[in-house]
Regions:
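Short, surface-exposed, charged/polar-biased interaction segments
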Residues: 41, 45-48, 67-70, 86, ...
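Membrane-inserting effector segments that mediate pore formation, membrane fusion
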Residues: 5-67
């Protein structure tokens, strides 16, 4: 098993994980030098790397990983389910590498910590057996492709506060969300307007969440 994946596994179930919340917002240098958490497996590994060079990608991955772990351990997984999953990956290195390795690859792509929190919520749903591994893969790709600036608009659609594109100047956001396969656009109206002598045709649509989008958002908003 890859060393980073192994340390990630140890950190995910570490007895000292509960102290992370107090330090998650501090800088990376403060994290790796803090006596209270510097022996945390994933921090210890990154500390060795970062002492050699100030690699911005490694620093970001450490922050995203700790954000993920902090969210994962917010006490809404039963001890039974948690231990069941822990035993599975401890006794199956291939499963551990496939699943935790995939999570690390995704975290390495993220810049916004909000995405790491979303991913952690999805992973918790998987551990609780609310979604399958295939669904986790599908939903995690949605997070990966999501523009974080579009999430507030997606939330408005999910909550029913926005149900069409009338008078909106950010249709591009609708098109981006539609490309993720989680909203439905249905024809509402079409009109022709003239601006500075140039004619344009505007088509407005009703907006709803499809079942896939509802399930995704039910997890993310929990």
């Amino acid at each position: 098993m890859d060393q980073l994946t192994e340390d990630f596994e140890k950190s995910l179930f570490s007895d000292t994980k509960d102290v992370l919340g107090d330090y998650i917002e501090v800088g990376v240098d403060a994290l790796i030098n803090n006596d209270a958490i510097k022996e945390f497996p994933i921090i210890k590994t990154f500390a060795a790397v970062l002492k050699i060079g100030k690699n911005i990608h490694d620093r970001n991955l450490l922050k995203q990983t700790l954000t993920f772990i902090n969210e994962f351990n917010k006490n809404n997984i039963s001890v039974e389910r948690l231990n069941e999953y822990k035993n599975q990956i401890e006794n199956d290195s291939k499963k551990c590498e496939e699943e935790l390795g995939r999570v690390l690859l995704l975290l390495n792509n993220f810049i916004d910590k909000e995405k790491s929190i979303m991913l952690s919520k999805l992973f918790k749903a998987y551990v609780k057996q609310e979604i399958s591994w295939n669904e986790f893969g599908e939903y995690s790709e949605i997070i990966n492709r999501l523009f974080i600036q579009d999430f507030s608009f997606l939330k408005e659609i999910y909550l029913g506060r926005v149900n069409d594109t009338t008078d909106r100047n950010d249709i591009y956001r609708v098109e981006r969300l539609n490309s993720l396969g989680i909203i439905v656009m249905s024809f509402k109206s079409s009109r022709i307007s003239t601006i500075n002598g140039v004619m344009s045709n505007r088509q407005d649509s009703y907006l709803t969440m499809n079942n896939n989008g509802k399930k995704f958002m039910n997890i993310i908003m929990n």
